[in-house]
Amino acid sequence: MKKNIFALIIGLISTFGLHAQALQDTVLTRQLELQREFNPTLQDANKINSLPVVREPQVTKANTDYAMWTTRATPPFEIALPRPGSIMTDIPYTLQRGYVKLNAGNYANIDGAVGIKFLDSETNKVNFMFLHNSSNGNIDYNQDVTPNKIKMKYMDNFARLNFKHIFEASEFDIYGSFLHSQFNYFGNNFGETRMLDDNHQILSLFNLKASLHNTQPQPINYSGTFSYNYFSTKYGKTITDESFGGNQVDAKLDLNKSFIGGDNLVGIKGEFTGVFYDEIKTLGEDEKISNFIMVDANPYIHLEGFNWKMRVGANLDFVFDDENKFYISPNVSFSTMVSENSSLYLNATGGVGKNTYLDMYRESRYLLPNTIVKHSHTPFAIDGGAKIGALNGFRIDVFGGYKKTKDEHFLVLQSQPQYQEFLIPLLGDLTHSHIGARVHSNIWSPLEVAVEVKKNFYSVSKVKGLDAEPSELKAWNKPGFEVDIDATFSATDKLKVMLGYYFANERWSIAKGINQELDDINNLSAGALYNVNKMVTINLKANNIFNQTYDMWYGYPAQGVNVMGGFTFKF
């Protein structure tokens, strides 16, 4: 079987080629990625910039890019803990060879980075970066329990070496990276014995990734990538259990060809994911872990007119794990300009949520060790909206959507048969609809403001993994109503002031078969950045200024008011 698997991998490598995704991190290392700009506006601000005006007499095709809004399904982890990049400064790599950054604050929060370019020619680029993020402070539980506090500890160290070569008509990228992450499971066990006795879990992850894509039009345009990950952990479900590890291989390919002239394309995308887990002898027969293989094909046609774009395609997903499955779902998008600055869009998509070990670690590192979450399937997801730009620098987006997912997972604190410090996945069928609006304003150039309001509606059925079913099934740990506000004010050419606010309510969890309503997230943050000179920048940021008490997951409290400050030195 393994010989066949490796033969399949080799065949996919030769078939898919390599894809340039410009030094992107893996899903796991995104937890550590630094935002190279100190720009506290909404993360999706790029997607809501004002649409270009069609000018005469030059005929220019309007910008009708598909509006695939990626709204979060759970409260952002970064609002609870100071994450790398929260107060990072702009690194003008074109002028400087490298940088050193260090921030520190209460709760022993530390955020550091070092980066250097070894080579930066027109055709070859080599650079290296090292990131550090850690915390080691006491936090209070929000439940009535003794002891009522615990030390939350984590330390992530990430290093990456990148190489890029620019050919005449294509670009090739390759990088290697290593992540060493250690942390404790600080969840509330309500006085029960801690399974890992507060020892540090450790994840080690090695990643090698290469990619290639054409930069000039070709008879057949190509874009491909290949990625290999090796990961291992230190502890299983107890101190004496065998630990978890394995290999993950990902390959992607996009081939398309112009037809009927213009920007019309016919193409096919392919994707392969293979996760091969090490055998764990200490698991019971009903806990055996299956390898995961998924092969996806997405044939599509892309059509464009003067003021519209349309993509018609389908997702064909073949999944092989403990049982073999075939799924088909739509992949259709349409957008059109209805006036000089306004547009409408509609998308109908679907697909498979892989939920590999690395996917789940990115969502929450506190998942029960040696646990694999079953893949989910979305037969269809529909979203649409209107983007209205009445004034230059002012934009309103109204949106809504509806989605059905089979085997959606909900992470809750393990409470049966007794409380433990881990999160476990419950699986159920989820219907999720939402409506909302975004406003982005930069009418007065020194001030940029982005506001998003969203209301979610959930319906849950066929939940698996419950020992005792509550009177009502909830979409556990998914917010009902959200408000996200970010503002940046450039007081001078050297001083920037920022303000951020995130609110989420109607959050639920479950413990001992009883629904538990979580406290609202009511997080206000403020910060400032000052450029002392071209080489030195200092910054200060405060999170959770209201010192609100709430759980990220039931039994996993967030830090109270926390302040970080530091500097960036560019050389």
Residue ranges and their predicted role:
Residues 65-67, 529-530, 535-539, 559-571:
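Outer-membrane beta-barrel "beta-signal"
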Residues 114-118, 159-165, 208-214, 251-257, ...:
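Residues on the lipid-exposed face of transmembrane beta-strands in outer-membrane beta-barrel proteins
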Residues 359-375, 405-429, 457-484, 502-531, ...:
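Outer-membrane beta-barrel domain signature, especially the mid-to-C-terminal portions
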Residues 135-139, 146-158, 172-221, 227-248:
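Flexible loop and strand-edge segments within Gram-negative outer membrane beta-barrel domains
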